């Protein structure tokens, strides 16, 4: 800023009687003090003061609208309605204590009369109402065997896209090898890795000893429809990563198209619970082929690269010609600029001793 511009600005701002031409200074410097001045209070466009969580007492004194709605009669009624809704949502109907005790008794192996009576009242017609709690339920009521969903399904109809899936109600049986038991995977069963493919008859599944008492109501409904191999239609849905044999629909024995450890993962829940420690899986065949084939390819590539390098070695004439042509073509694009590589006397200097 030049001196004349500063004079014009100061003359326009200063009053005429207090004008000092020799000692020009800005008028705002007089008003400033060396101490810190109080900042102006912020105000929102709607007229309220901003509340960042530190001014609760001040906002109560002013009586802002936000605190009125929170502590007033309207806020109390809204809170009462919310608590009533939560009570209705979380309330357990009458007889739930009996159903919980009945679930504990059935897990211990004792018959329960209160749970049977409650289920007879709550289950609609056509369902397994006449069966006792010790008898296995059908595949449609397989949710009752899940841990944590048994006493709720006795009073509230439980509907879920996972449970009502067609694959859960009608499992597919393909020849001597069974497909995946989906309710077992929904309940949290993990497949046990085994290196032998299971091709036993279907009736021998019931003789496998059980190690977990809670998985019995889940696996019993699945054993009934699977006892007849081709009685139910095969569902078109297949689990992810499951490969179907082309001739398994006819029932012919076919060699496995994938490594054996893949087929052993899809077993019944009883067989999975019976094996305590996962056995060592057989390594797949495809990586072994690639291990044998990769060194040959790499050796061929290395020999080819060596031959190319031998052709273009700097000692031969062809290699020197190519390098000279490449240098000349690279140096053409620069307008008269010289580099150290253009002068061999500078580029081939002896290296210092400390390097």
From Swiss-Prot:
Subcellular locations according to the entry: Cytoplasm
Molecular functions (GO terms): RNA binding
Region of interest (Disordered), ranges: 1-146, 210-230, 301-330
Chain intervals with Polar residues compositional bias: 39-49, 91-110
Biased composition regions of type Low complexity, renumbered to the chain: 123-142
Coiled coil segments of this chain: none
Keywords: Cytoplasm, mRNA processing, Nonsense-mediated mRNA decay, RNA-binding
GO BP of this protein: mRNA processing; nuclear-transcribed mRNA catabolic process, nonsense-mediated decay
One GO cellular component term: cytoplasm
Organism superkingdom: Eukaryota
Compositional bias annotation for Basic residues: 57-67
Function: mRNA-binding protein which stimulates mRNA decapping.
Record-stated family: Belongs to the EDC family.
UniProt name for this protein: Enhancer of mRNA-decapping protein 1
Species whose genome carries this gene: Eremothecium gossypii (strain ATCC 10895 / CBS 109.51 / FGSC 9923 / NRRL Y-1056) (Yeast)
